[in-house]
Amino acid sequence: MSDKKKELRSRHWYGGTHKDGFIHRSWMKNQGFPDHVFDGRPIIGICNTWSELTPCNSHLRILAEGVKRGVWEAGGFPVEFPVSSLGETQMRPTAMLFRNLLAMDVEEAIRAYGIDGVVLLGGCDKTTPGQLMGAASVDLPTIVVSSGPMLNGKWKGKDIGSGTDVWKFSEAVRAGEMSLQEFMAAESGMSRSPGVCMTMGTATTMASIVEAMGLSLPTNAALPAVDARRMALSHMTGKRIVEMVHEDLRLSKILTKENFENGIIANAAVGGSTNAVVHMLAIAGRAGIDLCLEDFDRVGGQVPCIVNCMPSGKYLIEDLAYAGGLPAVMNRIQHLLHPDAPTVFGVPISKYWEAAEVYNDDVIRPLDNPLRAAAGIRVLKGNLAPNGAVIKPSAASEHLLAHEGPAYVFDTIEDLRAKIDDPDLPVTEDTILVLKGCGPKGYPGMAEVGNMPIPRRLVEKGVRDMVRISDARMSGTAFGTVVLHVSPEANAGGPLAIVRTGDRIRLDALKGELNLLVSEEELAARMAAWQPPEQKWHRGYYKLYHDTVLQADKGADLDFLVGKSGSEVLRESH
């Protein structure tokens, strides 16, 4: 037996001749594992977020088999285990409420079991960041395998995109331009296979960031969920994680500031989701990396969007895969990236794009013909968002990026839904819609309701965008001139709480400014009179979340989870 094998963490579980070693091995053998798999080889955990209630991840047990084949081939011992699964399209009030709970689940499962390395199988929006947050707090060798996008949606002979076309079709029904029967008929054609949204929503955004940060093998981001090459990728990931254990290539060696900056740049280039901001901040907090909101402006603000995929463009992720995938995107923007940043492959990230080619210049645009110049997520500050807010220029209307208008305020999401279709709602296309009470504490969980519907009376006149401001998030598949993540949120006593209908607001996304045009004296008087809303949650996880969640500009993690505790071998259990 080599010294390497003696040093493996798993030997504290399976290597002894004492009572506890007997217990650990004996009960594992009831699954049919033979003696020799406990000979000191690396034990690889496959952390699986499979669930039938998470349609995006419904095929992950199949991909897990691919990972296992690779682990066995490389001389390891794979063990699959479940963790919480967050179905974005199914959970209420919002999957984001449970991202931190998933992170706790992942962290404690990895630490508590006798494993030497871990493969994270995720996909649906919050599963990838939740798994990475948990894994970063333990710091074993770690690789991500994403579930991959669904096949392109098809309806009436054309491609339709998940999420993005839902919002468009819904507004068309409200405007009387689409029948309810047509709306329902499009439903089955939109989701034709397992996988995540095939638009550049949060799931593929996070998969793209993961690949750009060197946390997965190349091509992980865009290969369709049902493409045989994703199964092969899973197999190769299984082989590689065993090698990483022998190399002691831990997650902390990959989660560098340079790789976070590469992730920010990639997010801008693909027209990625605003949700990436809050997730990357949370992962950085676990990894001990000094990442702040201003870094997204500094690093990504001037990066062009060159991926012509919905919601910013017209194609879908299956098209991106066939056009060359993320390696081809990185090849085009390589002058902006840190080429020597480390990867799970043990090579510099530049090797990921070295041989990549672009096969469709309309899907992956040349730098001299971008979809949108200076398209990175912009950070806004001002007296309405002292700690920051974000906007996605690539999905906004250019003429609204600098806009001043009167506010119309909705105090809650219920208030909005009760009034938005009122034919007498006193708004014009210059009005700025403001929604309160939808931040981390307020909703709770900072739901994806920031892309408020356009008032029906304006939709019927052909208006399809207007400035909207909230402390909420929005789906990565959504679009519009939408200011999000206003911090501090209304329920935490941020200035958003004291905005009144009729107040004038000025947005200047190019200058990074968001201001309430009310005198300092009036603002101070309103704030002095403000009372926090009554606390609704008196027990359980909701109370824990409300009492300890950080604001959006800090990643909305729970305050006591920031940082790491490591992979210490814990006390024996018997």
From Swiss-Prot:
Its EC number is 4.2.1.-. Keywords: Iron, Iron-sulfur, Lyase, Metal-binding. Binds 1 [4Fe-4S] cluster. PROSITE patterns: ILVD_EDD_1 (PS00886). The keyword Iron-sulfur applies. GO terms for molecular function: hydro-lyase activity; iron-sulfur cluster binding; metal ion binding. Pfam families: ILV_EDD_C, ILVD_EDD_N. It comes from the Bacteria. Disruption phenotype: Cells lacking this gene exhibit no detectable phenotype when grown on galactose as sole carbon source. This is Putative dehydratase IlvD1. It comes from Rhizobium meliloti (strain 1021).
